[in-house]
Amino acid sequence: MSAQRLNAAERDLEKFIKFLVLKSTQVVVQSRLGEKMQTQCNPLAGSDWFNIAVQDHPEVLDETKRALNLKTGESILQRLPLCVEISLKTTEGDQMVLEVWSLDLLQPQNGASPATNDLNPEGQTLKAAHAIYNRMGIMLKSLISLTRTTPAYKLSRRQCPDSYGIFYRIYVDRPQVHTLGEGHKHVKIGQLSTIVGSLVMSVAYRTKLTISPTAAQSESNTIMLKSDHFRPATDANTPGNQQQTQNGTVVAKKLGLGALNPAQGTADRRFIDIEKPLRPGAFTDMGKLKQYTEDDFVLPETPPFEWLLRGRGSVESLNRLDNNSVASVNISNNNNSTQDSKFNQISNLNNNSAGFKSFEKNSENSVSPIKSLLIPASATATYRHHSEPSLQPPPDDDNLLKELHFPFASPTSHVNDLAKFYRECYHAPPLKGLNELQAEISSISSTPPASSGSGGVAACGPTAAATAIATSSADASAMDDLSRQLEQFETSLEDYDKLVSQFGLTGSSSTGSRSSGGLQMSN
């Protein structure tokens, strides 16, 4: 009777161990899916093994049963240890084993069970069965907690099809810890003593997460091979797959939210041969194809975009033109010092405009559709500097050559109006100030009139009368010009305000034309 009870207790323990193995593989694999597991509280927990709600994944359950390969009447104690291997595989094809979970059964020494030595073996065996069932539940809870603490859990949460994926493999054999590299750690999750032996649950995980292709090679392999010597095998009859399917092992399966296509990782990579000539497309006229030679690939000695650079001849011609205009203005000023100032201003303006037009004719061969704005030193500025010797002239600065380029402007762009306005403002004749007018009037009035020596009475000859008339006419004309200019400025005050406001906001082309007209009115 006691032997029958003992056999029944052993069968119950074998049943408990079988479901512990199935639930352990489910816990390990589901923890590497890359998502958090949420289970609802079940008030009727009688149907849940070990009082833990662990949903069975059909694929994992089939892989576990295929690895155990239990036959009819065969005990699961003979198929232990069972291992679950978690590995990482990158998109480049590099693979690295992260951890190995194992559940092993250590047989009792001398073939004696601890329950047969007691006085009441039947009662001790029944109590041990219930205690073992509760201890198995505690061991399974410890496994759930520990699967979230290893480095592979963080890697599984970050997996994506573009970088790497997590795979699992279930096999019946001793844990292959040599694939974990140097410095791996081994942790014992729990140990449970039963009448059939001691159940030991442990994990060995990798600490160095650096992928090295030569880490998994054996020491005896000293043959140097090319990097692309081994091709990914797609046939199940290849030696690599046959080695994996021995001893009840199975091929590693893909984990994650969505499994990839099996042919995706095993497809041959396509390589592009640069030296191979390109083939023409369909319906191509072979006569129109250009045959390239080695001369077409020789880079020219001249720098690229040289045509955008301004030639030295244009600057030299501009300098010569500027020097000639300044010299001619100085000669004319020395010869005609008694002429009217208004006539001098008009002649200087004509000289400047003629010089600018001649420069534009010389620069007609420019490639850019918008001509660059080149402004030479005006003769009017030279005239003002000669008339005011007290002021220091500005530095030469390449003869006051100012240059503005618009290489990317279209012919209809508003930048032409801006250049025209700037050119007219730069060449505008200078206005005489009040100090200059007062100096001329005082110089004329300070000239003493001619007197006769006999009676002391002023002579009223034609020379004195002409001098007085010229003095009065000069004063009247100067005052008339000044009053006329002031009236024009006052009447055009609104236009100047609009001009200033438009320059501050938009700077349109109409502003330039109106402002240039206002400046021309001041002549």
Curated annotation (Swiss-Prot):
Keyword terms: Autophagy, Cytoplasm, Phosphoprotein
Region (Disordered): 504-523
A molecular-function term among this protein's GO annotations: protein kinase regulator activity
GO cellular component: Atg1/ULK1 kinase complex; autophagosome; cytosol; phagophore assembly site
Keyword hit for Cytoplasm: yes
Domain of life: Eukaryota
Sequence similarity: Belongs to the ATG13 family. Metazoan subfamily.
Protein's job: Autophagy factor required for autophagosome formation. Target of the TOR kinase signaling pathway that regulates autophagy through the control of the phosphorylation status of Atg13 and Atg1. The Atg1-Atg13 complex functions at multiple levels to mediate and adjust nutrient-dependent autophagic signaling. Involved in the autophagic degradation of dBruce which controls DNA fragmentation in nurse cells.
Name the UniProt record assigns to this protein: Autophagy-related protein 13 homolog
Organism this protein belongs to: Drosophila melanogaster
Classification lineage: Eukaryota, Metazoa, Ecdysozoa, Arthropoda, Hexapoda
